[in-house]
């Protein structure tokens, strides 16, 4: 069996990072995103300055303010977070289509079969971190390992803004010293039961047979045995049906005018064509669209039914979209809405039986 290469990407205090990016005066101060204390709100996330005071996610805002009286609490802006998440996933898709989102700010990537960087998962993770930093001005932590269980642990190993790699030959020694509380699925109740049995780390777990663990923990005992040996065969689940295919680029220097934007279209269109070829037979292309993000982070998206997907059509859309802001542009994107042909195929199979 080919050795898998799994990357786990986790944004660092994601919501708070977006707020500090968009409101630079918040940076360096204790900050939380959540509901107001007056309305019994809770903390969704907070930056590391706030965590130094003991502020944590899911804590009541009132309690958080007692721990940190200087804490600034801002309301969540979900659309801003979703947009940032979409930009990050657009970066992911430059390396692999095997992406399993866990939330807006966290995902697994299977890069086992990619040819980027000669197949080096470590270099891919480094490049993703670089691009997210340059394009979105936030940081992500990454873990690289032969499976999902270890990749997720690795991404947390050097947080924030870190990269940790567990190579196949390091798995046995690395896992042996792991506390059982690090194992996927082990909560307080299971950890307490393991502790009563004298099991505090994976080396202790390895001393027990699979049968003994199954007797104590039922079917989960088999899972415990596998994790203690660094085994996790769960695939990266990529079952979502795509609604569009797109390509976008954030430019190191803002594009000053419409002419500069139009010059970038041919390269974007070529990349879009390559991505569409990979999905041939799965989707029917629909409306073309363009996305423009201006230098002040305001943005607009414009699509048109019945328009072509040639360079001229995208030039017309871009011209109209640019006119909505008329300011220097930091990001350009183009794409196509998709209609899933697999649903139609499944219906045909259903009625042909």
From Swiss-Prot:
GO molecular function, one term: DNA-directed DNA polymerase activity
Required cofactor(s): Mg(2+)
Cellular component annotations (GO), alphabetically ordered: cytosol
E.C. designation(s): 2.7.7.7
Domain of life: Bacteria
Keyword set includes Chaperone: no
Family statement: Belongs to the DNA polymerase type-Y family.
Family matches, as HAMAP family: DNApol_IV
Subunit structure of this chain's protein: Monomer.
Name by which UniProt lists this protein: DNA polymerase IV
Lineage: Bacteria, Pseudomonadati, Pseudomonadota, Gammaproteobacteria, Pseudomonadales
């Amino acid at each position: 069996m080919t050795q898998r290469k799994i990357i786990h990407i986790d944004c660092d205090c994601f919501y708070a990072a977006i707020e500090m990016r968009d409101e630079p005066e918040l940076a360096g101060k204790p900050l939380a995103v959540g509901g107001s204390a007056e309305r019994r709100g809770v903390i969704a996330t907070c930056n590391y300055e706030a965590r130094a005071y003991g502020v944590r996610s899911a804590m009541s805002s009132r309690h958080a303010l007692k721990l940190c009286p200087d804490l600034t609490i801002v309301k969540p802006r979900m659309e801003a977070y979703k947009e940032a998440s979409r930009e990050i996933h657009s970066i992911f898709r430059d390396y692999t289509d095997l992406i399993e989102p866990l939330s807006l700010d966290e995902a697994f990537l299977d890069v086992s079969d990619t040819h980027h960087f000669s197949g080096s998962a470590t270099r891919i993770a480094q490049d993703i971190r670089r691009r997210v930093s340059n394009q979105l001005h936030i940081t992500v932590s990454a873990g690289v390992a032969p499976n999902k269980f270890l990749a997720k642990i690795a991404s947390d190993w050097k947080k924030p803004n870190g990269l940790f790699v567990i190579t196949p030959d390091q798995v046995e020694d690395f896992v042996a010293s792991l506390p059982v509380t690090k194992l996927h699925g082990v909560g307080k109740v299971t950890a307490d039961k393991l502790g009563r049995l004298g099991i505090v780390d994976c080396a202790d777990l390895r001393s027990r047979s699979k049968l003994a663990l199954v007797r104590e923990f039922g079917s989960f005992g088999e899972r415990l045995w596998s994790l203690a040996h660094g085994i996790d065969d769960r695939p990266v689940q990529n079952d979502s049906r795509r609604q569009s295919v797109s390509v976008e680029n954030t430019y190191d220097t803002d594009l000053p005018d419409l002419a500069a934007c139009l010059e970038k279209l041919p390269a974007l269109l070529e990349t879009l064509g390559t991505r569409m070829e990979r999905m041939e037979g799965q989707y029917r292309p629909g409306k073309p669209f363009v996305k423009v993000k201006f230098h002040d982070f305001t943005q607009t998206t414009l699509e048109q039914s019945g328009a072509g997907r040639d360079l001229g059509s995208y030039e017309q859309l871009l011209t109209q979209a640019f006119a909505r802001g008329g300011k220097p542009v930091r990001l350009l994107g183009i794409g196509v809405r998709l209609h899933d042909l697999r649903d139609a195929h499944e219906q045909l199979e259903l009625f042909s039986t």
